[in-house]
Amino acid sequence: KAIGAVNTVVNKNGLLYGYNTDYMGFAHLCDAHGVNFAGRTVLILGTGGTHNTTSAVARDKGAAKVLTVSRHPDTEKGELSYAEAVSSGAQIVINTTPAGMYPNVGVCNLDVAAMPGLEAVVDVVYNPDKTELILRAEEAGVPVAVGGLEMLVAQAVYAAEYFLDRKFEDAPVEIRRITAALRRDMLNIALIGMPSCGKTTLGRLLAKSLGRTFVDLDEEIVKTDGRSIPDIFSAEGED
């Protein structure tokens, strides 16, 4: 009721019961990574449904203030622009927008490096595993910088509890296990080294043993550009 939305509906003897396991999943994510909301100023990027979910979690966990950031801020609602957000004094940033989501990776609308005092940056986006926002937060030395994959898994586990009408005693362990397995499948292995050091040979062996697709970037560049690598270097240099 506080969020105004459900994502899990269970039929119990003809009556429909609605639950929001996104709330539970986000709460699990924050607890698992030591995000402390008590007395903190929280900055939430975005104004959609996930904003309401994360805002409810932050408030329930004792946040002193929850601020909303929008590309088109409604000043009557007290919303901030991204430029204003930098000087908000927030300790916690939560991204609920699709900024940085695959295939538009590399997008980051907030300059976290210019925000001293940040304790945590949480991004609900789970593909890629680390968005540009999370990468920049890590580079800036923010103590906690985490993406949304574990939230996705947690909300699914909690939804399964409602559907099956039973609690999983080992739910936290199972959430960690599934998250780790998904992360292994999601992440690529990149081999970097000098010419003729064996990257292609080792890459093909790894791909075969792990059941993954092998991609040679030199071959992909030649396909796209229509020139050989030596010809490209000769014409444009190696930088």
Task: Map each language-model feature to its residues.
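Conserved lysine of the Walker
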Residues: 199
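Phosphate/diphosphate ligand-binding glycine-rich loop within oxidoreductases
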Residues: 1-33, 128, 134-136, 140, ...
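Glycine-rich adenosine-cofactor-binding loop
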Residues: 20-23, 30, 35, 39-59, ...
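NAD(P)-binding Rossmann-fold cofactor-contacting core
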Residues: 60-78, 217-220, 224-225
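ATP-dependent small-molecule kinase phosphotransfer cores
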Residues: 219-239
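Hydrophobic positions on the alpha1 helix immediately C-terminal to the Walker A/P-loop
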Residues: 202
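Rossmann-like adenosine-cofactor binding region
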Residues: 77-145
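Adenosine-phosphate binding glycine-rich loop
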Residues: 124-187
